[in-house]
Amino acid sequence: MRPLVACLCAEWCGSCREYRATFAAFSARYGERCEFAWIDVEDESDALADPDLDNFPTLLIGAGERALFYGAVTPASAERLVAGAVDGSLAPSAGADALELLGRVRRLLEERDGGGAA
């Protein structure tokens, strides 16, 4: 199963809009080895059970049934995290709340894609 990198954002957030090009570049670079999802938490608040985010954008990285990372990071740090998820060197550092959110994100993506989430 490919790792999943979900960017949790909000349409009104200027930082999220600026981050979108960086996220697209990650997808172009790592897309064959990792799944990427851009998720507006306000549009998907019901499916995500209204997650309590401290900062935008927030990355959620998971592999299999493990939540590897959950938090806000700079683009440079995000690239290191994505590379670590892809090569298997990223050690899990996210808690139970991130694991629950990862499950909700996967279900949302399955609904969007008709069962195609990683």
Which residue ranges define each predicted feature?
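Acidic/histidine-enriched, glycine/proline-rich intrinsically disordered or flexible terminal extensions
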Residues: 91-118
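Short alpha-helical
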Residues: 14, 43, 76
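Glycine-rich, charge-decorated loop segments at or immediately adjacent to ligand/cofactor-binding or catalytic sites
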Residues: 48-49, 98
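Non-catalytic, surface beta->alpha helical segment in thiol-disulfide oxidoreductase systems
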Residues: 55-100
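Chalcogenol-based redox active-site neighborhoods
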Residues: 17-21, 25, 50-51, 68, ...
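Thiol-based oxidoreductase modules, predominantly thioredoxin-like and allied folds used
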Residues: 8, 27, 31-47, 53-55
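Local sequence-structure signature of Cys/Sec-based thiol-disulfide redox active-site neighborhoods
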Residues: 1-30
